[in-house]
Amino acid sequence: MTDHKIIMLLLLGIYCIQATQFTQVNIDNGPIKGTLQYVEGRAIRVFKGIPFAEPPVNNLRWKAPVPYTKKWHNPLNTTEYKPKCPQYVAPGTVPEPRGISEDCLYTNVWAPVPEYHGETFPVMVWIHGGAFISGSPEDFGVGNFSILAVTKRIIIVAASYRVNAFGFFSSELLGKSQLEARGVYGLLDQRLGLKWVKNNIAAFGGKSKDITIYGQSAGGISVCLQAVTPLNDLPGEKLFTRVIGSSGYCDILPMTNNSADAGLVQKLNCTTKECLYALPWQNITNAVGPGFLSFQPTVGINKFLPDQPISLLADRTNPRSKNFVPDIYMQGFTANEGTFVLYNYFPQTYDNPNTPGFPTQQMADALSIASGNYSAEFYYNDLAPLYSTEYNSNVTYPGQGFISRVDDIMACNTRRNMIYWQQSKKTKAHSWYFDSAPDTHIYPSWTKVFHESDVFYVARRCDGLWCTNLTCQQDNLGKTMNIYWNSAIRAASLTPKNKMDNLRDVPVWPQYGKNEVVMHFTAVGENKGPQTSVLFSSIISADGDYQYLQRCKILDRVRAEYYNIPALDPETYLNACSK
């Protein structure tokens, strides 16, 4: 090895002990020690378990996170993941090797090794999903994004945040002192994690003014909420510049988690906040159980979400608004979003053509469970009949109508969000529709493209469970998606101009506007990337006599009446504000 390379490694803090290569950087608190790993023959620095907040235990439970300010002089070992935040674990489940603990607010960093002195990197912060009731940064294996990190020279960061009752409990028992943070502790954890990135990422070679947030499912909702919160307009609170949201959107959220809060308090037999604070976390997770969407961010009782997200989005993207908006907003969804919900909560109708399926009332009840915020009454008269067994008598599997409805929830809400984002003069808005099915041991073939499948293509790796294999054609599609993601992260543009990507290999991805054009990601044949852009209205085929956009209009009308909010007039927005 030449002398100058040895000096470069020493400057980067890279050294070997018994075949394990370590690397060291200095953050605000002191030096930290990570490991040097290799992905596709290229080195990447990996740091796991860096504290960014005080443990939210005892009197810090159900309060805004407190920055971790302790200093140290000897290198802190950051080579292993820390425990997951408290969440329900089903009986008989294999225990987490790293455990579960309330002391869970840590972040993880994957950083390329500089190839020349002074090389710096844009940053992508991953926010995990899990319906706000479960999950952690490494569940999907965010280290899988290491291919994106080394091939596109991007730093990947992923932090934990409180979920379930610990992240979104909003009972009045907590008292008025919690009004600033009540019901959004998990979102404030995300925000403190972003502040840590802003303040420390330069130590890893990152650009503190070049940060993109990317989330899926509850993470996709989270990145939208982070983009529309009024906290962005306070001094020192511009924490990111670009947003990528997969299978998540800004919509209506509960004013409080009344039923979940009351049920939890009753099960815990607590009538005072002192009782709630004194309980072991295991008592709380056991009382919550596996409830789907039982706890969510709340609105109107905290400073993070003083109003409904969809209203905050409409105000923020008004062309006359001077408030913060991201440089670019990318938002998309998969072809079979409802697969996950059907598989987990209605397995009797999942893969059995002989079950009775979903008559109208059962469909309304099921859709209420799936959406979290809408009651069965909301769905019964206008919406459930469009997807019930009586209406869809020609389907092979009774669950197909349910999956179609959840698909529409995702598609219609994505469309509504994009109509707002495209009117902002300062934001480049782009949307995608993902329609390529990886191999999976979990879902049968008729469910095709499941919730989260697009993330595996961006990572260009499977996790071995939900996704077991990507073909060469599918990996080529992943490479194409990487070109777009890289361009958005680097330049807030989906017209790639950097040297590492070849423009001739990818089709143009227009901004969302009057024609409502989206990118259709599908693997077709060898060496093919996405198809050319398509109109939003042509994405999903017609079900019976109802065209897709007609169903969106019905959903929007019923929604406006139910919540007493203005109905969206897409034509007005698209004609007046198109780009």
Swiss-Prot record:
Chain positions carrying an annotated carbohydrate: 77, 144, 257, 269, 283, 373, 394, 469
Keywords: Glycoprotein, Hydrolase, Serine esterase, Signal
Catalytic activity, as annotated: an acylcholine + H2O = a carboxylate + choline + H(+)
The enzyme's E.C. designation: 3.1.1.8
Domain of life: Viruses
Listed GO MF terms: cholinesterase activity
InterPro entries membership: AB_hydrolase_fold, CarbesteraseB, Carboxylesterase_B_AS, Carboxylesterase_B_CS, Type-B_Carboxylest/Lipase
Signal sequence region: 1-19
Record-linked Gene3D superfamilies: alpha/beta hydrolase
Presence of keyword Hydrolase: yes
Top EC class of this enzyme: hydrolase
Active site: 217 (acyl-ester intermediate), 337 (charge relay system), 451 (charge relay system)
Function text: May be involved in the disruption of the host membrane.
Membership in a protein family: Belongs to the type-B carboxylesterase/lipase family.
Name of this protein: Probable cholinesterase
Organism encoding this protein: Acanthamoeba polyphaga mimivirus
